[in-house]
Design a protein with these regions (language model features):
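A structural signal for long alpha-helical coiled-coils and helix-turn connectors
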Residues: 23, 97-101, 138
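Short, contiguous alpha-helical
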Residues: 5-9, 16, 24-69, 110-161
Length: 161
């Protein structure tokens, strides 16, 4: 697997780790001007789905994700609904991500005039941005912050263990 999809996989694992122990009540609390955690989950899922499932196939973003796209109004979806979108987006995009090579990363989508490698880096950064936001909201709600990033025994390919 190419290093960029591996980096996104690590980003997803950290995103998931910041959701551990979250209740529906806490996930739906909104501390303005931020969105609530459940909206953020669905918002990040929207990007994963769009970038790596729908757009490479030449389709518009799945309608279930559109309420959480860039610029969409704030809402407070149930945690389970947001998590279902997140799990589905990750599962459905894994096939593309696991097979992505230099040629696939160079492909330009018809919906966004950047290549998929650039969108992948954008998605990694976006996921980390919202991971930090979720961590901040959790702390404001009285939760303990997640410990420093877990690399899950990952090392850059080519480096000796």
């Amino acid at each position: 697997m190419h290093t960029l999809p591996q980096t996104l996989e690590l980003s997803r694992r950290e995103f998931d780790r910041n959701l551990t122990g979250l209740t529906d009540e806490d996930a739906r609390k909104r501390i303005e001007p931020m969105n609530c955690i459940s909206w953020i989950i669905a918002h990040v899922a929207n990007q994963h789905r769009s970038f790596f499932v729908d757009w490479p196939a030449g389709r518009e973003t799945d309608a279930r994700y559109k309420p959480y796209g860039y610029g969409a109004p704030a809402s407070q979806p149930p945690l389970e609904e947001a998590l279902a979108l997140w799990r589905d987006a990750c599962r459905d995009s894994d096939a593309w991500l696991q097979s992505a090579d230099e040629a696939a990363l160079a492909q330009v989508t018809p919906f966004f005039q950047e290549n998929l490698g650039t969108l992948l880096v954008r998605c990694i950064s976006h996921t980390w941005c919202h991971t930090g936001e979720i961590s901040s909201i959790r702390q404001l709600l009285g939760h303990r912050a997640a410990q420093f990033v877990d690399m899950y025994d990952w090392q850059y390919p080519g480096m000796s263990a």
